[in-house]
């Protein structure tokens, strides 16, 4: 299992467009990928789950990836977060 914490820096947090990008990225992998915020964990492959968290700017989130392609999955998620200027 791979687990990393991120600090959300995007002014709008994880709203519809970045949530869609994260879900699309996560959906490419067979591993279980979860996003945790304020003690609640959701499947990062679910747009409704991600949007339900209401992650705003300045928030700290944890992403866990567990499965056969976990290293590749985490690398892709990190790349998406950084490329889109969402998190540090």
UniProtKB/Swiss-Prot annotation:
The active site is at residue 15. Keywords: Cytoplasm, Phosphoprotein, Phosphotransferase system, Sugar transport, Transcription, Transcription regulation, Transport. Phosphorylation on Ser-46 inhibits the phosphoryl transfer from enzyme I to HPr. Signal peptide: none annotated. Residues 1-88 form the HPr domain. It comes from the Bacteria. GO terms for biological process: phosphoenolpyruvate-dependent sugar phosphotransferase system. GO terms for cellular component: cytoplasm. The modification Phosphoserine is found at residue 46. Its main location: cytoplasm. It holds the Pfam family PTS-HPr. CDD domains: PTS-HPr_like. General (non sugar-specific) component of the phosphoenolpyruvate-dependent sugar phosphotransferase system (sugar PTS). This major carbohydrate active-transport system catalyzes the phosphorylation of incoming sugar substrates concomitantly with their translocation across the cell membrane. The phosphoryl group from phosphoenolpyruvate (PEP) is transferred to the phosphoryl carrier protein HPr by enzyme I. Phospho-HPr then transfers it to the PTS EIIA domain. Belongs to the HPr family. This is Phosphocarrier protein HPr.
């Amino acid at each position: 299992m791979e687990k990393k914490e991120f600090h959300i820096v995007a002014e709008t947090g994880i709203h519809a467009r970045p949530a869609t990008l994260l879900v699309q990225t996560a959906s490419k992998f067979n591993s279980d990928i979860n996003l945790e915020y304020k003690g609640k964990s959701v499947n990062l492959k679910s747009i409704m789950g991600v949007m339900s968290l209401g992650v705003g700017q300045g928030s700290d989130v944890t992403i866990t990836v567990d499965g056969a392609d976990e290293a590749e999955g985490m690398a892709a998620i990190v790349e998406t977060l950084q490329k889109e200027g969402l998190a540090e």
